[in-house]
Amino acid sequence: FNNTGSLVICFDEEHRPALEELYQRGLSNHVPGLRIVEKEELHEMEPELSDQAVCALYAPTAGVVDPFTLAISMAENAADNGVEFFFNTPVETIEKTETGWLVNGEFETKLFVNAAGLEADDLHNMVCEEKIHIRPRRGEYFLFDKDAGKMASHVLFQQPTAAGKGVLITPTAHGNL
C-alpha cells in the first residue's frame, strides 16, 4: 500500500456545492483528515495540474496497491486458512440451508464470496430479496512510462457527474502513471 492521498478536482466555482456535498458525505463516513484545499495549496500539492482547477477535496488516507499482488496474496492467505477454490464452475443455483448455503446442489458452505464481476448482480439476485442491476461502463486504461510517474503524486479524480467519474490519474505502486 502506497499512501498517496487523493484529490477530487473542482474546475468551476459553480460545482463547489457538489464538492462540499461530497466532503459532507465523507465526514459522515468518518474518512479521516478529509478537507477542501483551495487553488494555491492545490497547485503546491500538484504543480502540473491545470490552472483551471479552483479547489479540491483532499483525502490524505487514500492510496494505491498493486492489484495483481494483492489478489494473489489474498488467495494464498485464503488457501492457507482452508478455503477451497472451484475454478471454471459457474454458479447456477444457490439455496439457503440451516447451516449455510448449497451451491449448484453440490457444494455446501457456511460462506461464499461474490466475486462475479459484472455478473455479480446475477449472483446477488439469487440470494437476496432486494434485486439489483449492474449497468456496466466502458473505460480505457493507459499505462505510462515511469518518467511520467513524476507528473502526479496523488490519485487525481475529476469531480464526478451523473455520467460517471470521468478521467482519473493514478500513480501505480511501481512509480508509473
Where are these regions (language model features)?
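Active-site substrate-recognition segment that forms the wall
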Residues: 1-2, 111-177
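A short, glycine/Asx- and small/polar-enriched loop/turn
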Residues: 14-17, 45-54, 95-102, 107
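Helical element adjacent to the flavin cofactor pocket in flavoenzyme catalytic cores
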Residues: 57-103, 107-111
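A structural signal for short hydrophobic beta-strand segments in well-ordered beta-sheet cores
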Residues: 9, 93-94, 169-171
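Short aromatic/hydrophobic contact patches that present stacked aromatics
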Residues: 6-10, 56-58, 141
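Dinucleotide-binding Rossmann-like beta1-alpha1 core, especially the glycine-rich loop
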Residues: 1-45, 166-167
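General beta-strand structural signal in soluble alpha/beta enzymes
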Residues: 35-38, 86-87, 114
